[in-house]
Design a protein with these regions (language model features):
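ATP-dependent carboxylate-amine ligase
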Residues: 1-167
């Protein structure tokens, strides 16, 4: 260990994998690519262990994909988070509100759950609702820099949206 400690200068994190965003705010913010129930469960379990405050999670599910995982995502998020912002991910040709309803129906009743199909405004609301000591996890897109909406692909990066709100 002593030999290695002198050799390791810095370890870069993988972009979009539990990536910390620090703009001087008094709460933690992480962006993660978690887009499966198991991945979301693991990320939120880790985030829960790092905060004594509220755990707030922003997430959605892709459209034109496995509809069966949507309720599982709602259950996984509700297992750890105090507040959920369920939003769009890459809705593709599906109605974002329909996807959101599929997720929300499985969120435990004791979890506060808000919805907003506009991902940018859901991220903004989650960040504005955070207090010192809280933790906000923005999940599902991670390193992605685009969002698929109907017949178009638009530039969209959770990290840039969050940083703009935090500055």
């Amino acid at each position: 260990v002593e030999k290695l400690s002198g050799e390791v200068v810095a370890v870069e994190s993988v972009p979009g994998r539990f990536e910390s965003l620090d703009e001087g705010q008094e709460f933690a913010v992480f962006v993660d690519y978690a887009h499966t129930p198991d991945a979301l469960d693991n990320v939120l379990k880790t985030a829960r262990s790092l905060t004594n405050g509220k755990l707030i999670c922003v997430f959605g599910c892709g459209g034109d994909r496995d509809r069966g995982k949507r309720p599982e995502m709602g259950r996984a998020a509700g297992k750890w988070a105090d507040l959920l912002w369920v939003t769009s991910d890459n809705p593709r040709s599906e109605d974002p509100d329909s996807i959101i309803k599929d997720i929300v129906k499985a969120v435990p009743a004791n979890v506060v759950c808000a919805t907003d199909a506009n991902r940018a405004s859901a991220i903004e609301a989650a960040l504005h609702g955070a207090s010192p000591g809280d933790c906000v996890v923005i999940a599902g897109k991670g390193h992605e820099v685009e969002q698929e909406l109907n017949d178009r692909v638009i530039p969209f990066d959770d990290r840039l949206v969050a940083r703009a709100v935090l500055q």
